[in-house]
């Protein structure tokens, strides 16, 4: 009886041993899956709540700006082609570093006395890159000179611009976030071969949209 009483334990021990082996094998082959961080989380952590809201309301800025400006300026708006058409961004929005011919157009207004459509004199701006591949844009001339960094976004057809303004004879713009009154946020897109635009929704100038067109200078400076 004693000898027989031990026999029923053999299959049980074998079963337990088999389960432990399977668990050990599962533990050894298990891998930890880490979800990649959303690109919008990176620039969103830097942008102020006000600028995140401006970017999120970009579609509304386009709609209201064009609705107000088209009755009197339809011909001028149409002549600008893709520059003044929403949702015109193409793939590969990253600009090539170098010097650019730039011009600005403001559309719509948030203040009664502001013009609903205005073109400004052309100027030069520059796209810079550092060793890490970070792209920045600097407006080189004028009394209001925005400068800032381009951030990757979840939307592969656009980059996010976060920058600030240099005023008057200031040599350097303030860092983004240093003076909220100068902070500037927008969307950077490629809209045609060798043509980009920077769209600033709800700027502090009294417009509803500010659009900067960028085309590379033909003769790039050496170096």
How does the language model describe each region?
Residues 1-8:
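Bacterial N-terminal signal peptides that target proteins for export
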Residues 20-95:
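Amphipathic/hydrophobic helical signal segments and adjacent flexible N-terminal regions
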Residues 92-159:
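Mid-length scaffold segments of soluble, non-membrane domains
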Residues 135-141, 161-164, 198-203:
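Short beta-strand segments that buttress and anchor functional surface loops
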């Amino acid at each position: 009886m004693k000898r027989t009483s031990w026999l029923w334990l053999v299959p049980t021990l074998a079963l337990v041993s088999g389960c432990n082996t399977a668990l050990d094998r599962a533990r050894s082959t298990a891998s930890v899956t880490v979800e990649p961080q959303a690109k919008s989380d990176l620039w969103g952590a830097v942008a102020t709540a006000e600028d995140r809201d401006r970017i999120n309301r970009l579609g509304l800025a386009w709609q209201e700006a064009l609705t107000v400006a088209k009755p009197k300026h339809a011909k001028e708006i149409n002549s600008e082609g893709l520059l003044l058409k929403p949702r015109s961004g193409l793939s590969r929005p990253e600009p090539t570093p170098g010097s650019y011919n730039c011009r600005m157009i403001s559309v719509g207004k948030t203040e009664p006395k502001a013009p609903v459509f205005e073109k400004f004199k052309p100027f030069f701006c520059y796209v810079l890159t550092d060793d890490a591949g970070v792209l920045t844009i600097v407006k080189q001339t004028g009394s209001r000179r925005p400068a800032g960094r381009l951030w990757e976004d979840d939307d592969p057809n656009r980059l996010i611009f976060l920058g600030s303004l240099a005023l008057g004879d200031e040599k350097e713009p303030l860092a983004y976030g240093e003076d909220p009154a100068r902070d500037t946020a927008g969307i950077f897109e490629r809209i045609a071969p060798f043509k980009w635009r920077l769209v600033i929704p709800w700027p502090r100038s009294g417009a509803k949209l500010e659009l900067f067109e960028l085309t590379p200078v033909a003769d790039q400076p050496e170096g």
